[in-house]
Amino acid sequence: LAFEPAEEDLMKRQPRSKEDSLVNKRFLGRIILSGIVIGLTAFGFFNFLIQTNHELAYAQTATFTFMAIAQLMHIFNVRKQSGFGLDKSFFKNKPLIGALILSMGLQLSAVYLPFMNELLGTSPLQAGTWGIIFLAASLSTLVVMGLKKAFQLK
């Protein structure tokens, strides 16, 4: 995110007070809110998988993958102070795109490469599980975005 181009309305905003730290109460509130939403969703997802008779390693792998995907999607909540960060300006940040592709590649490696399965205790996921993971991650991202607006945690 360090390579993010400036937002168009940046100069219209009031400047931050020199006494304020970069991690102020509002920003800390967003971090805590996001952590709670993603954490509760992960807990619910794991519980759902266990209750539907999936093996422990499978449920752990799916939950681990959900958390990785949710964090990748959460980038779109933090790219901009207001609104959603998936717009045309996203494609101007090549390092961020590279980091997302690399992160997804590493996650796929952790899930599907046999030596990584052995090393990390993961197991390959079925295609349908990926659909549920992306749905849950998308919903948690939308919930965080909605709560951010509701509490005006810009």
Indicate residue ranges for each PLM-predicted region.
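C-terminal transmembrane helices and immediately adjacent loops/tails
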Residues: 1-154
